[in-house]
Amino acid sequence: MKALTTRQQEVFDLIRDHISQTGMPPTRAEIAQRLGFRSPNAAEEHLKALARKGVIEIVSGASRGIRLLQEEENGLPLIGRVAAGEPLLAQQHIEGHYQVDPGLFKPNADFLLRVSGMSMKDIGIMDGDLLAVHKTQDVRNGQVVVARIDDEVTVKRLKKQGNTVELLPENSEFKPIVVDLREHNFSIEGLAVGVIRNGEWL
């Protein structure tokens, strides 16, 4: 990485802090306002300079299309609460990055998902655990998957037959989720490949 000027470092720090506090990068207008630039165009020029130096990536066509490359390379992205209808790996869902070797899991983990609820506790996936996920749609019946039904994301064991998908919990207190593929949007976000235990259970 090339050294940043003082002003570029200010812009970079603002982006990083804004993501940490709000879960999403700032707009050009917000950068201009916070740092006293005359216009969003001035902020854009600084963003382009940061992109040339390899510390951010500018995603075209989005007002908040800024991605911190340094942090992406520094561990697996940790996905927290997922907003309805938005991509799982959208920047605003990334709580941070976790220092773990993706190669510890087979196949390799692409991201971590913070587990909410106890529907899979009988196979050791507890509330608050970090689920290691391999991003793929190539899954088989009987595997534990991260699935999206319409706007909701869930972790369950997959059973598919014809136009019907059953998402099976591993806890007798929960009922299977039955999905009619003719009536609902359904997709697989990834395959569960491991768990990092929440220390509160130890």
From Swiss-Prot:
Its EC number(s): 3.4.21.88
GO MF: DNA binding; serine-type endopeptidase activity
Swiss-Prot/TrEMBL GO biological process terms: DNA repair; DNA replication; negative regulation of DNA-templated transcription; proteolysis; SOS response
A Pfam family recorded for this sequence: LexA_DNA_bind
Active-site residues (renumbered): S119, K156
Catalytic activity: Hydrolysis of Ala-|-Gly bond in repressor LexA
Cleavage (site feature) positions: A84, G85
Annotated keywords: Autocatalytic cleavage, DNA damage, DNA repair, DNA replication, DNA-binding, Hydrolase, Repressor, SOS response, Transcription, Transcription regulation
Protein's UniProt keywords contain Metal-binding: no
Enzyme class: hydrolase
DNA-binding region coordinates: 28-48
SUPFAM superfamilies: LexA/Signal peptidase, Winged helix' DNA-binding domain
Family affiliation: Belongs to the peptidase S24 family.
HAMAP family assigned to the protein according to its UniProt record, in alphabetical order: LexA (MF_00015)
Described purpose of this protein according to its UniProt entry: Represses a number of genes involved in the response to DNA damage (SOS response), including recA and lexA. Binds to the 16 bp palindromic sequence 5'-CTGTATATATATACAG-3'. In the presence of single-stranded DNA, RecA interacts with LexA causing an autocatalytic cleavage which disrupts the DNA-binding part of LexA, leading to derepression of the SOS regulon and eventually DNA repair.
Assembly mode: Homodimer.
Protein name stated in the entry: LexA repressor
